[in-house]
C-alpha cells in the first residue's frame, strides 16, 4: 500500500451486520461480522486486534486470510474489484483494559457484579469486530447481540432494540457513522427517561449501586442540552434516542458514542442536594460536551485524526456556550478562563508542544494527540477567538451550512473555515492557519519608544525554546480604538502615547476580555498605570493580569520577586476568578521554599495575611442567598487558610470532622476534600486511615472517593504512604481509571515522593500493560514532570525515560517533560533567594 494511503481507499464498507455471542464467565466473544462494500483492488486489508480468525468468505467463497498483530490487520485476496460481501467468523476476548468490549466491576451489599460496556475510540472497534477502523470509513451498522443473560438485566445500544429472537437482541440499523462510535452495554441497570420538545427520547442509565435520585440532575441537563443544540445548530438531532450511561470502570471522562454516550460515574450520577457548585458545573459541562459531539464529531466527523480538533475543540467550546445558556447564574465562562485558558497557556509555552492540527499515523500516536491542554483547551480558545471576531449570528449560520453540507460524512479544517468565513464575509483560513498549524503562542511586548506606543510579538517560552521566527495574526482586542483589529506584522508602531492616553482617559490594554490566545508584557510604567486602577478593572481583567504576570515569571521575562508585592492588591476581591488566579500564583510560589523550613513559614504568614479576612467572611458553610462567586471562592480561600496554618481554620476544620465522625460523606461537598486533608495531616491515625479507606472501597459516590484520595495522600506517615502504594496494583481497592490521581497525590507529598517514584520505575511494565492502550497513559509522565523540581530528580527522570524515547506515542511527551523539569530547576535556582526575600518584605 502506498505510504499515507488509507485502508478505506481500497475497500469502502457500506454496511456491517455484527453478531456477537458474549460469555462473561469464560470472557470469550464468538463473533460473525458481515461487511458489504466496494473494493478498488484485489488485495483487501481490514483492521483487527486480538481476534482469532476462524473463517473468511467473500461472496460465499472461502479465502485464505493472514493476520498481522503488529499492524493490527487482516489481509486476503479477492478475485476482482467491485461490490462484495465479506463474512468473518472469529473469537475475541473480553478485555480488562477498559478498551474494546470490557467488564466494569462494582459492588452492591458486598456482592461483586459487572456491567459490560464498550470503548472504541480511537482504534479499538477492531478489538470487537473486523472493520475498516478509520473515521472516514462511514457505514451503517446492524447489531445482534446474545449474552449469558440473567433476570433483571438490560441491554442498550446506539439504536433502539427491535426484537429478541432465541436470546439474540436485534437493534435497528444505525445511520451512516464511523466505527469508533458503535456502542452497547448490558447488565443490571436502572434508568430515568424523558423526552425533548422535538420528540427525542432522553435516558440516564446507571448500576443499581446508585440512588435513583442521582440520575435526575444529568437527565435534566441532557434534555435541555439536546434542545439547545437543535436550536443553536438549526439542525435536528438525527437519532430516536440519546442515552447517557455511567460505567463503573471508564478510562476517559466520557465518550460521545452516537445515541449511547458513556461516562465515568462521577461525571453523570451525583447527589445534587449535596454536590458542590464546582461538581455540578463539571457534570453539566461534561454532558454538554458529549452532546455537542452528536453533531460535531458524530454527524460530521474529521476525515482523519490529524483534524481531531474539529471534534474536540468545538465540543469544548460548545459545552460552555450551552451551559451559559442553560445555567446563566453560574457565569460558566469564568470557569473557562480559570481552567481551559490557564492550562492551554501553561502547556503551549513548552518548546516541542504539538500544534492543534498535527500529523499522526500509528494508533499509539493517535492516542497521544489527545492532549487536553492543546486539542481541547487551546483549540476551544481558538474558536472562542473566532466567535468573538465574527459574532454569534455568523457562527450559527456557518455551522448550519457546515452540517448541511457534510452531514453523515467527513470534513477537514478547511471546510469549517470556508463555511464560517462565507457566513461572516471574511477570510478566516490564513488567520487561523497561524494558530492551528503552529505550536505555541506569542507574547506581545508593549513599550513606549521615542514617545510612540510600540507593539512587538515573539513566541513565548517557559524554559529553553528555539526561536523559529514564528508569527501570528493576532486579534488585539484593545481598549484603544486607534489600534487595528489584527496585528499581522512582527512589530506595530502606533501614535504618540501621551496623546492616546489623554484622549482615551484609561490605561492602555490589549486582549480585553482575555478571548485571544496570547499574553501581554507591558513595560513597567504601563503596567503600573493599569495597577493604579486595579479596583476599577473587571474581574476578568484582574484575572488576566495575574495570569500574564505568573506566566511571564515562569518564562523568566520578569521576576517572581516583582509579582509578590502585588498580590495584596487582589486579596479582598469577591470574584471567584480573581481568587482562583491569585492562589494559582501563590501555588507557584511554593516551589521556592522547602517543607517545614523558615522560608515556608514566611510564605504561610503571607498567605495568612492574604486569606484570613476572606476566610472569616466565608467560613465553612454556605449562607442564605450568597453569590455563586462566594460558593466557588470558599474552597479556594479555605485551602489557602489551611496551608497558612491559620489556627481558626485548622481547629474549625477538625471540629467539622468530629461533628460528622460517623458519616464523613455528609461533610459539605465543596470543602470536604480540604477538611479531610487537614484532618489527615494534623490529626491522622491508623484508625482514620482505615475508616476513610473503607469508605473509599464501599461508596458509590465518585466525588467522595476523589476527596478521600486527595486527603489520604496528604499523610506524612511513611507507613501509611507505603500502604497506599501497596494498593496501586490492587484493582479491588484502586481501579486503574483512578490510579493516576493516587500516584500524583503520593508523588506530590515530600514524605511519599520516593515511594511513588520507585513504584512507577519498578512497575512500568505493569502500568503499560494495564493502561498502555488508552489515551491517558502518557499523562503519567506529564504529572511526574509537573511535580519534580530538583536537579537530582531531573537526572533520574532522564535516566529512566530517555531510553523510552523511541516508544510510539511517548517521544514528544518525554522530550517536552525533560524541558519542563529543567526549566523549573533553573527557575528555582535563579529566583529562590529573591522570592524568599520578597515574601519576607511583604509581611
Residue ranges and their predicted role:
Residues 99-100, 156, 181-185, 215-217, ...:
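Short conserved micro-motifs at the rims of enzyme active sites and ligand-binding pockets
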Residues 1-240, 266, 371-377, 387-393, ...:
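Acidic/His-enriched low-complexity segments
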Residues 25-27, 135, 252-254, 700-701:
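Short glycine/serine/proline-enriched coil/turn segments at secondary-structure junctions
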Residues 103-105, 156-163, 185-190, 276-279, ...:
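Short intrinsically disordered coil segments
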Residues 139, 150, 165-166, 238-239, ...:
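Short, well-ordered loop/turn elements at secondary-structure boundaries
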Residues 144, 202, 292, 359-363, ...:
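Non-catalytic accessory/interaction domains
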Residues 53, 115, 171, 204-466, ...:
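Hydrophobic alpha-helical and helix-loop surface patches within well-folded domains
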Residues 57-60, 111, 194-199, 261-262, ...:
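Short alpha-helical hairpin
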